[in-house]
Amino acid sequence: MVKTKGNQKIVGMHPRNVLRTQPDYTKMAIKYKDFRQQCQLELNGKVSVNFRNEKTLRELTKMLLKEYYDLDVDFAPGSLVPTLALRLNYILWLEDLMEPLNLQNIRGIDIGCGSSCIYSLLGAKKNGWHMLALESKPQNIEYAKENVKRNHMESLIEVYAQPDNTNIFKSYFEQDQQQLQYQFCLCNPPFFDSNLPNPLGGNTRNPERRPAPNNARTGSQEELTCVGGEVQFVQRIIDESLENKERVRIFTTMLGVKANVPRILDYLKELQVANVSTTEFHQGHTTRWAVAWSFHSEPLQQGTT
């Protein structure tokens, strides 16, 4: 159980992140009934939030999306519940990468949008981006489409059901008659290696363990694991990026293990991809890493959030 204090600055978070100042959960509990039911009232009149409870995390994320972005989002049972601060840090970094391009219309690809479709919804709502949300799990597709419809985002977001989850872009691009150009892709890859005896035990093929999460772990096995873990998944994106240099301007991905960053950078170097940028996403006690690469001549913006 975590006692909450509003108006505290969270060190290291992106300066434009609305959650950099911790929300006043006591006020939020008064305003949002479903969230209030997951809170515990302390003797001093303040509320405590148990971040290790999955149901609490669901109501917390739903409440924050409604409060800050007027988004009504639901999650499929047993699916990944995204933490908003981290997703915002990723979106804000993409904004920073897009800024030098000075483009009026921006199109992005959300690889594995999940049931919430949160990245696409945030990108569309916050920036008016046109998003292609890719997803292979039927239940997630159903919920993602409903989330888009509920928030009247059909004109900005297309949820595409990938028939084959062994490829990233191929299925959609082969049937895309318009041959649209995309300015970026984003990805929150499955962290864990399904080849391991205990894939959700925290280990990847890298000997360094991923730090245990402070929040309750949510998500289906399909969302959290894949063959080879996040390194092999991202390498597949890199391989396909070589075939789609003209379709996507900037390729990006998040990583959950710091030691995997140099492994991805080495793989890009082996393939002679020189235009590369890295960053870190800080949100409270949790840090994630991200890598961007491009085949265009304009250097990618460097720096961390």
Swiss-Prot record:
SUPFAM superfamilies: S-adenosyl-L-methionine-dependent methyltransferases. Its EC number is 2.1.1.346. It catalyses: adenosine in U6 snRNA + S-adenosyl-L-methionine = N(6)-methyladenosine in U6 snRNA + S-adenosyl-L-homocysteine + H(+). GO terms for biological process: rRNA base methylation. Residues 197-221 are annotated as: Disordered. The keyword Transferase applies. Belongs to the methyltransferase superfamily. METTL16/RlmF family. RNA N6-methyltransferase that mediates N6-methylation of adenine of U6 small nuclear RNA (U6 snRNA). This is U6 small nuclear RNA (adenine-(43)-N(6))-methyltransferase.
